[in-house]
């Protein structure tokens, strides 16, 4: 059970423990506290899985340790809720698997064979000893006979000479015969000894062979039965854990149809394909048929029709091959011509900012470059052309971009974005500065009592309309100059002087706006005099300088003429300077 769980989870069984008999109503914090108290001495660990086993009527948990386990420290039980929880480690699991194996008669058979071999060896030894004893007895008998013959020879020597010669010959013959008999006996004894030794060795070899054969038969039988038990356990737990693994690994794939509808919020095919590849990795334990079924459940529309047609032609078509076919269909739909047309027809939306439009245009440009519809060397030129023709840049930015286009130095993507940011910031600061100048208008001095009485009312009106204030101020100044100026030729100088100061023409007058626009364009970002604060300072100086400097000489001359006309009426007027 432990090995099967570890094989399914892909962990090392030697560094894992299996905890059984965990109550179903045991809370997570109670389980963690009990496991921590019992397993913390073994080292760092993590709980891989904790599931309810219907056949056990309780939960089971698989725990993996970071390092090898010390078998002497592994607890057999864990004190927890509902009673002790059983702990199973790898050696205990192997013992539990083999403890129910019945004892076979192979070992007694081996002992009987060994016992028979021992008896045969003992009999061989006894036979060899008996044969050796017989040989010794024969040898002693031969010696006795030889002694007797020798004695007879001695008697013959003591007798007559003839008899002595005959007896000597007989003694010699007897000695020779005795010697021959003794030699034969010795040879027989040696042969007996060798035979005994051979029988003993044969019996010993037979006994050893019997013992080895018995042990081999017993080991083979034990391995066969043990393998059968392990295989039975493996199949049982595989059938039990298969639904669990399917439940853990099965996660629905996001839907994909391949439709292109304006209101459709479906994700792109590239992102869906990456997610599908990851899901196939999680479905590795499922069968190929189940993987195809799950893939078909996530498809709809054109994508479903394509995969269904492929499976009708080849029922053994794998899920990976289905993804490959979908990639060939949906990735190749944007040809180089389609990508180029999408880029060339991209237009700035009504509520879309210029910065956002340029970013969206860049995405289409990069796709066109990938498809080969646009050469990379022409990317900056085409980007600038599309911004000028399909976007709505400000006049200052448009002049700057057109000058870059004529000079054949189009900006790249990042430089164009910086230029747009700088232009937007400059336009905002210019608008704030112009609004501040219109509110802080300089007061106008006037000798007309009616104009002086009307000045508070004009001030209130100027607060309501800053443009009307400038127009009223210019009109009052023109009236005063026309009243005090000489009748001959001086009326033409006053408007000219006012126009030179920039106060004689109102902002709403014809010709005023182009002059202001021209100055703004010259000082735009990227222009010849790019200083955003320059126009603000010039405008402030024009607003702060009172329009009375050009009128002072005219007023003084008119006052002198009035005094001379009153004091010297009838006298000719002397030329000035005398």
From Swiss-Prot:
Residues 147-159, 174-211 have a biased composition (Gly residues). Residues 106-221, 441-578 are annotated as: Disordered. InterPro entries: PNMA, PNMA_C, PNMA_N. Pfam families: PNMA, PNMA_N. Residues 112-129, 160-173, 449-461 have a biased composition (Low complexity). It comes from the Eukaryota. Residues 462-473, 556-566 have a biased composition (Acidic residues). This is Paraneoplastic antigen Ma6F. It comes from Homo sapiens. The gene is PNMA6F.
């Amino acid at each position: 059970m432990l090995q099967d769980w570890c094989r399914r989870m892909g962990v090392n069984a030697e560094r894992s423990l299996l905890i059984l008999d965990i109550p179903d109503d045991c809370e997570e914090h109670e389980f963690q506290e009990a496991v921590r108290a019992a397993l913390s001495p073994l080292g760092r660990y993590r709980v891989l899985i904790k599931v309810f086993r219907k056949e056990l009527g309780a939960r089971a948990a698989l725990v993996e340790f970071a390092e090898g386990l010390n078998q002497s420290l592994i607890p057999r039980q864990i004190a927890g809720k509902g009673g002790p929880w059983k702990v199973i480690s790898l050696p205990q699991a192997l013992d539990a698997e083999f403890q129910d194996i019945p004892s076979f008669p192979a070992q007694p058979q081996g002992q009987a064979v060994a016992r028979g071999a021992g008896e045969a060896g003992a009999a061989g030894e006894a036979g060899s000893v008996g044969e050796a004893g017989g040989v010794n007895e024969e040898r002693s008998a031969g010696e006795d006979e030889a002694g007797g013959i020798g004695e007879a020879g001695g008697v013959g020597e003591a007798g007559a000479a003839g008899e002595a010669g005959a007896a000597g010959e007989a003694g010699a013959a007897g000695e020779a015969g005795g010697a021959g008999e003794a030699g034969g006996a010795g040879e027989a004894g040696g042969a007996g000894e060798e035979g005994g030794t051979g029988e003993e060795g044969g019996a010993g070899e037979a006994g050893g062979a019997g013992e080895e054969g018995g042990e081999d038969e017993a080991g083979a039988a034990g391995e066969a039965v043990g393998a059968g038990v392990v295989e039975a356990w493996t199949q049982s737990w595989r059938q039990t854990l298969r639904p669990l693994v399917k439940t853990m690994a099965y996660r629905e794939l996001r839907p994909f149809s391949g439709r292109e509808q304006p209101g459709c919020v479906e994700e792109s095919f590239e992102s869906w394909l990456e997610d599908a590849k990851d899901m196939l990795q999680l479905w590795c334990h499922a069968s190929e048929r189940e993987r195809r079924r799950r893939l078909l459940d996530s498809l709809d529309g054109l994508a479903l029709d394509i995969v269904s047609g492929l499976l009708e032609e080849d029922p053994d078509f794998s899920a990976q091959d289905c993804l490959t076919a979908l990639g060939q269909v949906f990735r190749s739909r944007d040809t180089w011509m389609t990508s180029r047309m999408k880029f060339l027809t991209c237009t700035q939306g009504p509520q879309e900012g210029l910065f956002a439009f340029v970013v969206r245009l860049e995405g289409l440009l990069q796709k066109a470059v990938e498809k080969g519809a646009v050469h990379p060397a022409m990317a900056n030129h085409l980007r600038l052309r599309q911004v000028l023709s399909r976007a709505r840049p400000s006049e200052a930015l448009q002049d700057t971009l057109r000058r870059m286009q004529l000079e054949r130095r189009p900006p790249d993507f990042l430089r164009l974005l910086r230029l747009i940011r700088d232009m937007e910031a400059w336009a905002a600061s210019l608008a704030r500065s112009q609004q501040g100048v219109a509110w802080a208008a300089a007061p106008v001095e006037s000798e007309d009592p009616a104009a002086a009485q009307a000045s508070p009312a004009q001030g209130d009106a100027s607060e309501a309309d800053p443009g009307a204030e400038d127009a009223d101020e210019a009109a009052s100044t023109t009236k005063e100059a026309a009243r005090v100026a000489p009748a001959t030729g001086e009326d033409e100088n006053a408007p000219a002087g006012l126009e030179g100061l920039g106060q004689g023409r109102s902002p709403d007058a014809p010709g005023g706006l182009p002059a202001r626009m021209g100055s703004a364009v010259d000082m735009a970002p990227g222009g010849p005099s790019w200083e955003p604060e320059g126009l603000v300072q010039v405008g402030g100086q024009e607003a702060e300088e009172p329009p009375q400097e050009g009128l002072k000489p005219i007023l003084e001359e008119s006052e002198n003429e009035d005094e001379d006309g009153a004091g010297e009426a009838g006298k000719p007027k002397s030329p000035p300077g005398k």
